[in-house]
């Protein structure tokens, strides 16, 4: 696990986040393209999703598109999976959302940035996947990139409904949303368990222990409140009885990102060394949840 944490690359995170937020071009389908918006209703979100798919394919991770319908329109989530070595039927799910808004989520927004919200979680999950693949863990780790989050958690509700209906059991659900803004000393990171809903506090304890065990440079805070209830993609899973938490930067106090849902949510306004630490903590947690010794 230590080697996996040391492999987290600030440069790779920076490069991908610059591409994913349209600051620089990305290569998708062999063509250089610059995305202008990740609005749920903008065609460029499709390019962004293809970028995610190609990143997984390039590192040899199985990935698929999972369509769902809202109001007669078809949208897609992206699902990547790293099979467990001994107990592949046990599944740990990590998630982030690929869509973004600059303040008018119901409009077809011509321009969004969404570096922190939730480019950070998206690119963080790609980095996590690379580490998890190398670790060869006993349990399966599945990574979801949801869409329609800014319209009311469309993609994650659809996906959680689908797997519950199929009788899929999950060890745990960890949503990573907004992990790249920290303007105060101390590197505070919040973990939300909706006040131990479905026994989710056990995951909070594991998160704290992982940070301490690997000397990760973060100050974790167990928010122990209902501030993010139904505001994050973990909501649908909690509704169905799964254990689940949200990992985020300081979300409910005075350290909140002032660029939230504006065109100012850009890479230059993010704290990427802080994000690296949160990604490391997420990898350490994933390893623990997926049966690492």
Predicted segments with their positions:
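N-terminal capping segment at the start of a domain
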Residues: 1-44, 215, 255-266
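Extracytoplasmic/secreted proteins, especially bacterial periplasmic and envelope-associated proteins
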Residues: 3, 12-19, 43-60, 120-127, ...
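Extracellular/periplasmic catalytic domains that process cell-envelope and extracellular macromolecules
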Residues: 7-13, 57, 71-74, 83-89, ...
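Structural recognition of the beta-strand scaffold that forms the well-ordered cores
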Residues: 12-21, 64-66, 77-81, 91-96, ...
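Solvent-exposed loop/turn segments at secondary-structure junctions
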Residues: 26-27, 62, 68-73, 84-87, ...
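Active-site-adjacent substrate-binding region
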Residues: 182-293
């Amino acid at each position: 696990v230590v080697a996996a944490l040391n492999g987290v690359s600030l440069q790779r995170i920076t490069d991908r986040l610059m591409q994913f937020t349209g600051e620089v071009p990305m290569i998708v389908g062999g063509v250089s393209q610059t995305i202008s918006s990740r609005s749920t209703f903008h065609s460029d979100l499709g390019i962004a999703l293809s970028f995610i798919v190609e990143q997984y394919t390039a590192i040899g991770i199985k990935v698929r598109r999972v369509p769902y319908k809202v109001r007669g329109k078809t949208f897609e989530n992206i699902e990547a999976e790293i099979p467990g070595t001994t107990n592949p039927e046990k599944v740990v799910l990590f998630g982030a959302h690929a869509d973004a808004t600059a303040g008018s989520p119901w409009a077809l927004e011509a321009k969004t940035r969404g570096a922190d919200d939730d480019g950070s979680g998206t690119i963080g999950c790609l980095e996590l996947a690379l580490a998890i693949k190398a670790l060869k863990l006993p349990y399966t780790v599945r990574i979801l990139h949801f869409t329609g989050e800014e319209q009311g958690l469309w993609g994650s509700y659809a996906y959680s409904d689908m797997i519950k209906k199929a009788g899929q059991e999950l060890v745990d659900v960890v949503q990573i949303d907004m992990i790249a803004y920290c303007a105060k000393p101390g590197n505070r990171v919040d973990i939300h368990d909706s006040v131990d809903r479905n026994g989710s506090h056990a995951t909070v304890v594991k998160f704290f222990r992982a940070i301490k065990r690997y000397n990760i440079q973060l100050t974790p805070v167990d928010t122990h409140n209902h501030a993010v209830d139904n505001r994050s993609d973990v909501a649908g899973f909690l509704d169905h009885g799964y254990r689940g938490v949200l990992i985020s930067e300081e979300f409910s106090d005075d350290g909140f990102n002032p660029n939230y849902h504006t065109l100012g949510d850009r890479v230059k306004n993010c704290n990427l060394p802080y994000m690296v630490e949160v990604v490391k903590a997420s990898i350490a947690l994933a390893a623990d949840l997926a049966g690492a010794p």
